[in-house]
Amino acid sequence: MAVLWLLWPCRVGLGWGHEGHAVVGLIAERYMTAEALTRASDLLDGSTIDSVASWADDYRRDHRETGPWHYIDVPLADSELDMARECPNNECVIAKTEQFLAVLKDPKADRATKAETLKFVIHFVGDMHQPLHDEDDGDKGGNARPVTFEGHPDNLHWVWDTGLLEHINRNQQDLAAELARHITDEDRATWTQGSIEDWVMEGHRLAQAVAYGDLGSQNPAVISPDYEKQAAPVIETQLEKAGVRLAYLLNTALK
């Protein structure tokens, strides 16, 4: 499936930043139980999942120590995860997501703590589905990998976080609805199997095969129309999976 790249001649500012994370939240809301939605709304003082989906990025600006919580640096060439090496002191997206899910399930945790941890979980599930948050090739997850995108110098991480999605000519509600229409019951059953670690390594393999695999040998690499067409179905499926999996995790944690 690749419904998005056909709509990419217009630049409208949709990124896997605020708007992209909101799309994940909107998809998740479609698959959350009534109980989980009610509990989430109570913890968020009536705010919706999508409206707080980028809170953790805003929080990070004043709390730099939380930066490593948004990603995990699995070496690009590796095929297996080594948590002791790649997540020292449990400071990575896998450990923090698991830690915060445990807090949400803890009947002794106070409401304010649960509210904060819920916002972290919402954001981190989105982050772990961006393949460049799951790898490192000695280039800070693509942040130090120069590329040329639309004739301008950029870096590979920005292209995947924001640049490619800026071509999608949809608002976030319409995009979430379009993506959700393609999600089947079989997809949901398949995508919710495995663990958070499995999902991260799935993203890591996409980084190997597509984000870097289709990049070519030029330095800086040129992000071509063919590269965009290869990346588009990866991006849309990762947004869909993130929404479905976020709903699955919250349905379990907010019983």
Regions found by a protein language model. Name each.
Residues P9-V12:
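N-terminal signal peptide c-region/cleavage motif recognized by signal peptidases
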